[in-house]
Amino acid sequence: MKGKLLSFTLFGESHGKAVGILIEGLPPGIEVKVEEMKAELERRKGIRRFSTKRRESDEPVIVSGVFNGFTTGTPVTVLVWNRDADSSYYEEIRNTPRPGHADYPAKVKFFGYNDYRGGGHFSGRLTVGVVIAGYFAKKLLERFGIRVRAYIRRIGPVECPQVEPEELFASPNPYCPDEDAFERMLEEMEKARKSGDSVGGTVEVVAINVPAGLGGPWDEDIEADLASALFRIPAVKGVEFGLGFRFAEMRGSEANDPFVVRNGRVATETNNHGGVLGGITTGMPLVARVAFKPTPSIYLPQRTVDLERMDEVELRLRGRFDSCIVPKALPVVEAMVAFVLADHLLRRKAWEGVVR
Amino acid sequence: MKGKLLSFTLFGESHGKAVGILIEGLPPGIEVKVEEMKAELERRKGIRRFSTKRRESDEPVIVSGVFNGFTTGTPVTVLVWNRDADSSYYEEIRNTPRPGHADYPAKVKFFGYNDYRGGGHFSGRLTVGVVIAGYFAKKLLERFGIRVRAYIRRIGPVECPQVEPEELFASPNPYCPDEDAFERMLEEMEKARKSGDSVGGTVEVVAINVPAGLGGPWDEDIEADLASALFRIPAVKGVEFGLGFRFAEMRGSEANDPFVVRNGRVATETNNHGGVLGGITTGMPLVARVAFKPTPSIYLPQRTVDLERMDEVELRLRGRFDSCIVPKALPVVEAMVAFVLADHLLRRKAWEGVVR
Amino acid sequence: MKGKLLSFTLFGESHGKAVGILIEGLPPGIEVKVEEMKAELERRKGIRRFSTKRRESDEPVIVSGVFNGFTTGTPVTVLVWNRDADSSYYEEIRNTPRPGHADYPAKVKFFGYNDYRGGGHFSGRLTVGVVIAGYFAKKLLERFGIRVRAYIRRIGPVECPQVEPEELFASPNPYCPDEDAFERMLEEMEKARKSGDSVGGTVEVVAINVPAGLGGPWDEDIEADLASALFRIPAVKGVEFGLGFRFAEMRGSEANDPFVVRNGRVATETNNHGGVLGGITTGMPLVARVAFKPTPSIYLPQRTVDLERMDEVELRLRGRFDSCIVPKALPVVEAMVAFVLADHLLRRKAWEGVVR
Amino acid sequence: MKGKLLSFTLFGESHGKAVGILIEGLPPGIEVKVEEMKAELERRKGIRRFSTKRRESDEPVIVSGVFNGFTTGTPVTVLVWNRDADSSYYEEIRNTPRPGHADYPAKVKFFGYNDYRGGGHFSGRLTVGVVIAGYFAKKLLERFGIRVRAYIRRIGPVECPQVEPEELFASPNPYCPDEDAFERMLEEMEKARKSGDSVGGTVEVVAINVPAGLGGPWDEDIEADLASALFRIPAVKGVEFGLGFRFAEMRGSEANDPFVVRNGRVATETNNHGGVLGGITTGMPLVARVAFKPTPSIYLPQRTVDLERMDEVELRLRGRFDSCIVPKALPVVEAMVAFVLADHLLRRKAWEGVVR
């Protein structure tokens, strides 16, 4: 994720020495508490029952950029050693790309040199770094009262009813503010798990107290930057803001949010627009939804091609798979949104500092 | 749109001297025919009946980067003078931001210095430059047989049934390959127009003959780059690839596309994934859908705030508005997709040139 | 010149329709006076006697990004139409690259598609755009009291003695604060002119009131960014800061500038370091020197190769050449320095806005 | 160093856990031999007698991006753990910035949060990462026969006579191809060392077999990109190409290099231009010179300011300092040049792959 003033680069492979992140542009003076960072990483493990059995402690090692408990302003590098990787299995399926996975296009892209073990650099394990980036970004946003929270909006056929931002931020349930919907989501995931299958879902992410004026037209469009960040998360196949695709079915008179005065400030009566108009934040809550496809690794037999012999074969995967990755995606989605917001906030401060 | 090797910057304002584009990174030797470029620009005007009455000839003036009918390899600048702008009206509504428009957040973003006339730099008129960028990108892609085409997938409640890529590229109808659906779309737009309202829709864009291996994980993700480009188009509120949001309702066993051998090459039996896995093209047709909200400018009365007096007022817009911008968005969507593909193709060629 | 928050792109060819510039990232609210801009452009014409006889009015046409006399915050495009170009001559020398010019490598780089007339995109005429960029950057810097001024430090064997910043900024002579040296420089240029030759020189540029803290180590190094900008000016072959190459001959004990307290602030007693330590400004005047090679276009006969026949031939140039480009380089050097400083100042403001 | 297709970011602090590098854009299939990499790192230690007594084994740990002995095409991270750091001393001088060092401006830049121990992120130790980047870049260049070599051109008053590229590449002396000059350089460094002082110098770097056509005008200028990279090396205060600053004293008729035919190819008779004209390589050897100031850390007493009490004090440094860093700069200079060349080579291949 390369912002103008804030960017990060993920490194590492699922079965290599480590995974990690290098963050550039973090301002100095952000307080860093490893326990807090670990708590965020813990969220990334999702609901144990529906997650891969690979369970590592994910101990973040801060290699650079933090001194005496605060960011220094120079590049921050954090890595997490890999410990519990079992690569033996991947040699078996090296020539039989898994449907729905990057195996085949990656082989083409990297001329066969890529580390194919456990998905290599494509592995969901790389999101460890994303969550760490989010940790720093959230700390920066907190200074301005900006908060970001994601919840599961859908698992397969089960959709959570629309919730108001206040409800969401007040909810004690870390996955979904609607307990009833959450129960049914769990059932859906369980059904998928039991049948050796997987299931998709959507995540809704909300950011509050975002000031108006972040973003801009064309190259500065904050929706475009957010979408760009969110699509980089593995398995994401759709992103929408506000009413998103539902706008396509509407008339302008229904879709437009009237401007009103609330507590002496400009606001909109409804928030169909999801907090962004013309690529710029309006001061209303930012609302986006992200579609995740079902994990492609499933236990059911699938058809694929043996790339050496160029014939079609049946593939039966063994290993430790998530039956649903949506619960573990929550902190990852939040991290991407927080990071983009932090970049745009910094850009805003640059202008505020010179426009008189 | 800033790619790694290919980027463009739009400039101009709706009621300023001109709108235009500067393109960097175009390789030398692309043949440029102004008539072809104009034909593309003509498509951008959409269906006359449902488009703004502002009708300009959109004569592209190539200012730099083209010599003897070919690109030179240095920055290409093309501009189109504005002629038919009527700004008188905009002074009236200067302090009453139009609902659904960028007026209010733009005023915050630009500290009140933005050119508010006709939407200024936010105007749909700026897409003139996008279409010009697309013209060059398509010419480059053509050398490799890559073709990009967009069609209207939905207008309000009317959805075009799924079409196969071959059908689409063979269709004589420039808006929608399904004549029956198109008829009903026209009716829908007419209804909106007559009631002084506007209507939204979706565009589906397909690219064929895209080689496998473009894109990459994380920072090189081609879906992210495409989404980033598409969200920069005004009024876009959602982007999805392949089955997109429908993936969220599915099981992995339904969603995964089996790999097969077709004509001695690796392909997938179905194309749920829309041509990209793990951020990398698979060689299958690239398929994306883009949601457009209804044009916010409507003739029906709306509520807004007078920013000077900070009280709520009724707003009745006069002017020349599109009742539906979806038809004119087609070449814009194609242009964005073509441009991103061209950037990734160039990056691919860099690696092909050094990996031995 | 691509900075993080401020960048510009030059476009146009010497004998094409126009030359111009697109500037991105300029904050809104910078007052623009065309007469001031023209005065800067006038400086770029140098001393009439030693400059090309091509004399155009260089009327800047502001195409975008300025509204009601102030920058809007969106991309600023300014162009200057070409009027007095005589291309007939260039067909003659198309296959015989001029020694010291980009003709030959440009032909290779652009696969023969480049506009070779008058140097095309390589022409010194493109510095029109640089000067315009400098105009905006200087206006921004002025708000913070930062001023940039360049003077001729050397023409051939004649060197101006070191001057103090105060002297320089107070000098009425626009080329060199030392009248005696300037007289001898003029003689040197005249001698070169009369013999159908050209002569090189150096420019020293000084910026005062630059706050401490701009720049940073490695990727943020402001000397590197300044050098990068300065080397983009045609004919520049060397850049140095402070004592520059003289440091190589020195001992640390001579070279180090002692820190002292001046008016209650930290300063250095001497300014050998030229205002930058470790890539960061110290608050002392920024001092850089730039070496310009003699204009390669001379009237004396030269040897070159006929690229078609691949044999060696004599080349006698006709045309209108500068006998010395150093005088006209002054506003160009200032512009590059001002632009880089403005970019770093913006970045600084971003951090100042969030570090608490 | 951020190129268009190839970039690296250094991380770490002198007395932190580690120093290292993350490289993005390296193509897959580059063979990696740790012993070769260590040999390059060994060169970075310079001549033992004149280098800091901190002697670490500099064992590179390849964390990511290399699989089965070849680059994978995903980000390469290499780190070297810090072992022999003694930080106790730095608390003493925390408030008394060392003359010639970044201590003072760094404190301003980072609002006091920077790791000041051993220079922190400004430490020469960070060049470990640069050398590693150079290792990869050189391997890529080797495929095309491109070789880069640097030598000491000057130490204080002692200058090595000009050498031809063939001589340089054939020389067995790793520091200077002229044995006599090298002897005198050693004496000069010894004199500085004995007097508790340090001495500056210049490095000349030469690249051979660079194809014509790399680089371009303005934003693509390869001299600008090289200078930008070279100025990022600590202590560099000047960069010049070909005759560099000597051009300023010359006439065009002396300076211009006649084009000639050599072995059926276009060449120049002389190489005053140093292999680049108009920002583009000409096919002649690339020649640049880099000025290094004397190491600011010396044992002689110096004057500085106590930043807390704001009064002037005498500073006597203790610690382990280089009396001359020029010998250890050689692989660092080579690395920067190789890296920039590799980036431009990749860009060239992109165009070669599409221009027909």
From Swiss-Prot, chains A, B, C, D:
Record-given protein name: Chorismate synthase
GO MF term list: chorismate synthase activity; FMN binding
Record has Repressor as a keyword: no
Pathway: Metabolic intermediate biosynthesis; chorismate biosynthesis; chorismate from D-erythrose 4-phosphate and phosphoenolpyruvate: step 7/7
Functional description taken from the UniProt entry: This reaction introduces a second double bond into the aromatic ring system.
Cofactor dependence: FMNH2
Cofactor note: Reduced FMN (FMNH(2)).
GO BP term, example: aromatic amino acid family biosynthetic process
Signal sequence interval, chain numbering: none
The entry's keywords: Amino-acid biosynthesis, Aromatic amino acid biosynthesis, FAD, Flavoprotein, FMN, Lyase, NADP
HAMAP family linked: Chorismate_synth
Enzyme class: lyase
GO CC field: cytosol
Reaction(s) this enzyme catalyzes, per UniProt: 5-O-(1-carboxyvinyl)-3-phosphoshikimate = chorismate + phosphate
Pfam (any one): Chorismate_synt
Gene: aroC
